[in-house]
Amino acid sequence: MQRYLISYEFNDGEDQEIGGDMLVKWYETGGVENRPETYEVHSWVFMIQNGTGHCVVSADSLDTIWILWHPWRKLMDISIQPCLDLEETISLIKKTRP
């Protein structure tokens, strides 16, 4: 599985409020338990004061990520980028050095 950084920012305060309600409903109806085995969250942070957040996940494909994130797409700008953790970064640097 590939590791990804997902960054997001709500369009405005109203969309953030709608998104918050959606998140609570998703969470209370077993959202975490219903994630596919091919999607793992490593960390998640949300700065509620400005409506932005970031999470690091591992997933088998971008399709898996978009299936999970599509309900929020109209409420926020979402950016997904491949990333590495510290050990993966060190390993890559060592492999590229002579």
Q: Residues of each region from the PLM?
A:
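Short amphipathic alpha-helices in soluble, non-transmembrane regions
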Residues: 65-74
